[in-house]
Amino acid sequence: MAATTENLPQLKSAVDGLTEMSESEKSGFISLVSRYLSGEAQHIEWSKIQTPTDEIVVPYEKMTPVSQDVAETKNLLDKLVVLKLNGGLGTTMGCTGPKSVIEVRDGLTFLDLIVIQIENLNNKYGCKVPLVLMNSFNTHDDTHKIVEKYTNSNVDIHTFNQSKYPRVVADEFVPWPSKGKTDKEGWYPPGHGDVFPALMNSGKLDTFLSQGKEYVFVANSDNLGAIVDLTILKHLIQNKNEYCMEVTPKTLADVKGGTLISYEGKVQLLEIAQVPDEHVNEFKSIEKFKIFNTNNLWVNLKAIKKLVEADALKMEIIPNPKEVDGVKVLQLETAAGAAIRFFDNAIGVNVPRSRFLPVKASSDLLLVQSDLYTLVDGFVTRNKARTNPSNPSIELGPEFKKVATFLSRFKSIPSIVELDSLKVSGDVWFGSSIVLKGKVTVAAKSGVKLEIPDRAVVENKNINGPEDL
């Protein structure tokens, strides 16, 4: 039986009894559920979709670069807050605790690199750019302990929690914790669209406004390309853009990513979930929808305050049905990128691919730990010796999924500057100082351990056993 608005009073009284939630969380949750039940999902009329112009999605190279003047740079940085989304766990990569504490390169974690980058800016320009981490209840305790190690760094680190909402038991439409599910599994963080109300409710937003801050740069903590960019910041301040989403050209790997469209005179995010079935292939085409959302967002702090106070941020709801411990539950989420249509003078900026370097799997770790990149001052920079603008495609079998097993299977990370693609399956082990070039496939037969020897140079080969080396 589908839930209707008639289920709302029962749900509301159950939520009132949940002492683990703050009043603002209760009202936020009820508001989200009532919007969902009233079916106010915004339907996209396909014929009204237009490709955004260069005024709406500005090419990065058309923006005026910032001068080398130290005073101008300091003035810009004094208006900035950097916020990293830190709610995710490293479970998919076989790690416990926050994903941001996975070691990326040279013994440094995502969080280490972020702190080093901001500290370098603060030291160089004599400014005080703060770092804010939005945690979830899954990462809050661990993060508090972890940030203690940065006490002596020249970065003010703030943390706050995003909202904690109860999962809803699908068939009865009641909060799971009300039925006795009191452990963490009964709850969920409602997506990063929650960043705006959560920042406001934490009191941090008012603190930053009182310090003269104007913009927050929001990014995923696992995107190594999401570094402070003064050219973008200067453009937004000069043009009074309340919101800016960084987009970048799609490749075949990104066909499911959200894109920016012009719709009824406003810029809007279009996600694959909103696309009618008959248009999904068109949505995935690189010809019509050429860009996708990197989730690097720049947002004016006063505008966030105004919109949150007016309860105006009614982003598209993403229903996320799950089965947990044999119970079918529903969690309702929103995405920060979908907020773009509520801000005045919102734009996209079409940035180089280098600003999108996410580490979602061990195959991404292989890229960033290899000679394809170098690490300088906390910045991961691409090796100029690589002539191909796109990265090699890398597919590693389940034996490499967890970070610890991935690392144990490489004596050292191979050279991949001249690699086009790598596909590895089965019980494969790599020696040290190996060079991979062109298209390489390594597939160990079932039950067979296949070792690639030290200093092997493998170019355009299919390897199924030692005899193929």
From Swiss-Prot:
Its EC number is 2.7.7.9. The keyword Ubl conjugation does not apply. Disulfide bonds: none annotated. Substrate binds at residues 87-88, 192, 220-222. GO terms for biological process: callose deposition in cell wall; cellular response to phosphate starvation; pollen development; sucrose metabolic process; UDP-alpha-D-glucose metabolic process. Keywords: Acetylation, Cytoplasm, Nucleotidyltransferase, Transferase. InterPro entries: Nucleotide-diphossugar_trans (IPR029044), UDPGP_fam (IPR002618), UDPGP_trans (IPR016267). UTP binds at residues 85-88, 99, 162, 191, 222, 360. Its main location: cytoplasm. It is found in: Cytoplasm. Expressed in cauline leaves, flowers and siliques. Pfam families: UDPGP (PF01704). The modification N-acetylalanine is found at residue 2. Disruption phenotype: Reduced number of seeds. The double mutants upg1 and ugp2 display severe growth defects and male sterility due to the absence of callose deposition around microspores. Induction: By sucrose. GO terms for molecular function: UTP:glucose-1-phosphate uridylyltransferase activity. GO terms for cellular component: cytosol; plasma membrane; pollen tube. It catalyses: alpha-D-glucose 1-phosphate + UTP + H(+) = UDP-alpha-D-glucose + diphosphate. Belongs to the UDPGP type 1 family. Converts glucose 1-phosphate to UDP-glucose, which is the major glycosyl donor for polysaccharides. Acts redundantly with UGP1 and is essential for the synthesis of sucrose, starch and cell wall, and callose deposition. This is UTP--glucose-1-phosphate uridylyltransferase 2. The lineage of its organism: Eukaryota, Viridiplantae, Streptophyta, Embryophyta, Tracheophyta. The gene is UGP2.
